[in-house]
């Protein structure tokens, strides 16, 4: 069924690779198309100006825009124009088209398959700097996928309801991304590249999806043609790989990981960490680990943490393992910086390979990045981590940020994708305490790491963005997902009681809980003043942890199912209920496995509308049985209520219902 589009938020963005197309996206392709049929769909190639239109059951389900195929040479953009020849031999379609340049021709090869087609196009007569393809967003209904937005505070869901501009979309991105997009009409796009791209979704409200790649090789992509978004997702996973295992244990799924960042920010020291951990334990706020957001490479680390073994022992007595932050970034102030430079262990400067590549890190300090593709550097770095485990009682690590930076050059013979592989292999040697990785791209899905979405500020708007980011990351192939961190961070004022409680409640109905701000109190980093939370907030947070812990057997079942199928655990409603049109724009509900519909309150107030898809549902808060599809208007959700519903006909319903009743999604 055709799915309508949501409201567009307008904005502007700088240009790096791609220049926006003029005007807005048109409708169908031009007149006189050449049609190539398969049993499942038709591909129509317009001849007056090269465009591709995918038709299933007589209806357009994806189309490129007019002027969709473009290329840039130097500072000038040129369009691909009329088709001059086309032919089909077996499953291969070949198309030749003219361009704005009289001596330059485009060759396009399409390989037709039963549920997809591969597109490969390039120039003859010139070498382009970049090749760009644009799709009409409206032709396929709503768009999803991509992963995280570069603006961490905004995550449009669906993508076309807002704007995304990522001029450095690559394996080295800080954001968790993959070159995969899917649509409400059951089509999808996968761009086959490991090089940086320029990606724009609805830039300036133009209604286009623009995908630009380097022009020194053909632009290669796959278009999936299925009946539902979930089937497209499974096609994608079949190519990049489903998780081979879960790096996270059952106990780590069951209780939160507490990270010290948003609690202490720049005041990371042994005394403060212990005081925080003791307050958590005294308040009955469970967790499996206390993770210190600091690295032993800091120049003053020994002053601030004089006795790591003693810290580890005391945390163990309180019920927590000790974890430490680590990353490949090495600022000039690091104790081992000079050694890393002298040994050639850092990525190299593109303008002078004899020098390390230095750039400004988040804290304003010049820094380099350890070169994991250099075997000697990798061995040196790994040896240091093993020493921490052996000598200091560190149980695991948080591997933070990226494993490569596009401002640097790869090790000779290595690609950007190799750094993803080296990074995941390195992290796999150590217990991450389910802090997960922020690394992605094709084939990283198979590693089975927990995945943290990006830091968010501390307001309700960012809680909603965190939920949408989880859905985006989960449905590009990273099912073991969590928000970073409950209550937000980014050195903003602490969250209000209401935001902190609601965030914990939402996280209780996700695969994993990742915490920092303590409901027992926190220092406001913007004022230096201590903030005491209401005792009721402690109780609500404790209840959220209890809910998640009781759901752990059900969640663990979903983990094992995901290892078989690759399906996401936290997923949008339309994955399970593709015929319910309303579900395609719901951004504040999700399915946790097949049986649990989570509808927590994600903004101020005490009521919310809840959409229930088709089926028979048990309202956990009220005990009533409801039939969908239905919209529950002004559903009562005071601060002590986390709306949740169990699909009584779904696998796992009995186990989920028992857990939610016992823990009390109403507490």
Question: Predicted regions span which residues?
Answer:
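Secretory targeting and sorting signals
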Residues: 1-30
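N-terminal low-complexity, Pro/Thr-rich disordered segments
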Residues: 23-31, 660-667
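Short, ordered beta-strand-loop transition motifs
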Residues: 29-32, 37-38, 45-48, 83-92, ...
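Beta-strand-rich N-terminal accessory domains
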Residues: 30-66, 101-104, 112-118, 605
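Short acidic-hydrophobic surface loop/beta-edge motif
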Residues: 34-38, 71, 95, 180
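Catalytic-domain carbohydrate-binding cleft regions of carbohydrate-active enzymes
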Residues: 43, 100-101, 113-119, 124-647, ...
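Extended, loop-rich substrate-binding clefts of extracytoplasmic carbohydrate-active enzymes
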Residues: 72-114
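Accessory, solvent-exposed terminal regions and/or long lumenal/extracellular loops of proteins
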Residues: 641, 648-667
